Amino acid sequence: MNFSTIEESVSEEKKKFNNFLSYFFKNSRVLIILFVLAVITTVSISMWRKSPDYQVLYNNLSNEDGEMIIDQLNQMQIPYKLSEDSGQLLVPKDKVYELRLHFSENNSPHRDIGYEILDKERFGVSQFGEQINYQRALEGELARTIEKINVVKNAKIHIAFPKNSLFLEDKKKPSVSVILNLKSNQGLDHSQVNAILHLISSSICDLSIENITIIDQFGKLLNNSSLGLNQIDDLKLRYSEEVESRYRNRIKNILEPLLGFNNVYAQVTAQINFNSHEKTQEKYTPNTNYKNQAIRSRQSTVNDKINNRKEENKPDELFPQTSFSSNKDLNSTTYSNKKIKKSIIQNNQDNNILHSNSAISHDDTINYELNHSLSHTKMNIGEIKRLSAAVIVNFVKDKNGKSVPINVEQIKKIKNLVREAIGYSKVRGDSVYVVNESFFQKNKNSPIKLLKDSNQSNFYSTFLTFTPWFISLFFLFFLVKKCFFSSSKNNINNQSYKNKTEEDLLEKDTKAENISELKFSKTSNTDKLIHQICNISNQNPRIIASIIRQWMSDKK
């Protein structure tokens, strides 16, 4: 590379830089904007470097504690940051432990008092004071325990202990009210509320769950111990819908693998009994089975008449009157009766000659046990009284691709599958109805149209939201363009005008040289030369005028 080319490139760069500086120095607006931007960037960088690292001082501060701590921080001239969503108070990292020690000495922030209040034993405290301290300690400990739940921000508990009474009729149970401050956009589900109820009831003696009331910071009752009629009806309706949807899903799950997706539609109606019903039944039936008969009691009586004289043997002398409670006693007694009968017969045979006119009567009374059954039945709430299912099945396609109805045998199979899926019971009076019809084809396109409409509405909403931003950006770009490029356009016009004048002068010089060459050239034909000069003068009279001026200056 030659030194001349290097010098030319350096000179061109110098010219560009000089033009750039001249452009910015001539345009004062650009200088002001650049100066303001430079000041803002330097200030922001310096503040960012000087800003200390912040660390959490306290979490979940109440409004009263937060105001008290912030006032003390302002008096101590310590910077802080307060997060309203999380309730965190941030202070510089190097002053966290110092501030915690300072606030702990001043007993701030205020925390719930627990069993540590009982550590300070005081002389002369009355029994009422001890009871109040115990109640405060129990309330504080329960509040701390409930605050361990992730959803709960803080808790406040009030316990009402009744006065002790000597009479059982006047004895009352304690009651508890709880207010929970939950975190933002979070809530307690039914299982968590039940857990809190059982936790409190098991922590306090003789406290039942019915005597506990839990509300949140918005005054909403969380435990449904005293539901209204409307709420109970809503729960019943919700339970019925859940049961019906469960049976619908069973029908779809068993038929869609056979008939295809979206070829089966089912509706199930469930009649549910929400009444609480209890029944106690006692039955007595005679025991007709001879082998399994159980004797409850038995009585035997024998009358003997000799020589027209009636003699009634006492049960204690000859025929004992016995009540039997078991089969063992019965067998022993029957054996003794057989002996007595044999002795009577022997005596009759021996005395037959002496006592020709004799008579014997024997009465035997037996009481048997009856079959006795006692049953207690409690009907569950929410028992299904009756189910009715309606199923629509689409036509199937044959080998040629045409929609063909299903035959009767397949419909019977589908009906049997539906019955088995819902647990069909003839005793309850359940009913199942299956229809085979062709589905309406435009329903397939309707979801797409709805999707398109939703997409269009979303597009219009986004377009309307971002249109003001686009307009403002375009307006700002227009102002910047007008500010920056107006002066550059003027400079470009001036530069082009200068270049044009220089080109005109060069053209004039070249033409003058050509004329001088024509003038000093030796030609044989002067008429031709004069004719050419006349043509040049007609075309460019300025050149002739400049030549004449040059001649006059040369003469001088």
Swiss-Prot record:
Broad class of the protein's primary localization: membrane
InterPro entries: AMP-bd_C_sf (IPR045851), Flag_M-ring_C (IPR013556), FlgMring_FliF (IPR000067), FliF_N_dom (IPR006182), YscJ/FliF (IPR043427)
Membrane topology reported for the UniProt record: Multi-pass membrane protein
GO biological process, one term: bacterial-type flagellum-dependent cell motility
Gene Ontology cellular component annotations, sorted alphabetically: bacterial-type flagellum basal body, MS ring; plasma membrane
Transmembrane segment boundaries: 28-48, 459-479
GO molecular function: cytoskeletal motor activity
Chain intervals for the UniProt region annotation (Disordered): 298-332
Biased amino acid composition, Basic and acidic residues: 306-317
Biased composition (Polar residues): 320-332
Secretion signal, residue range per the UniProt entry: none
Keywords annotated in UniProt: Bacterial flagellum, Cell membrane, Membrane, Transmembrane, Transmembrane helix
Compartments where found: Cell membrane; Bacterial flagellum basal body
Pfam families (UniProt xref): YscJ_FliF (PF01514), YscJ_FliF_C (PF08345)
Family label: Belongs to the FliF family.
Main function: The M ring may be actively involved in energy transduction.
Summary of subunit composition and partner proteins: The basal body constitutes a major portion of the flagellar organelle and consists of four rings (L,P,S, and M) mounted on a central rod. The M ring is integral to the inner membrane of the cell and may be connected to the flagellar rod via the S ring. The S (supramembrane ring) lies just distal to the M ring. The L and P rings lie in the outer membrane and the periplasmic space, respectively.
Protein name, per record: Flagellar M-ring protein
Species: Buchnera aphidicola subsp. Schizaphis graminum (strain Sg)
UniProt gene name: fliF
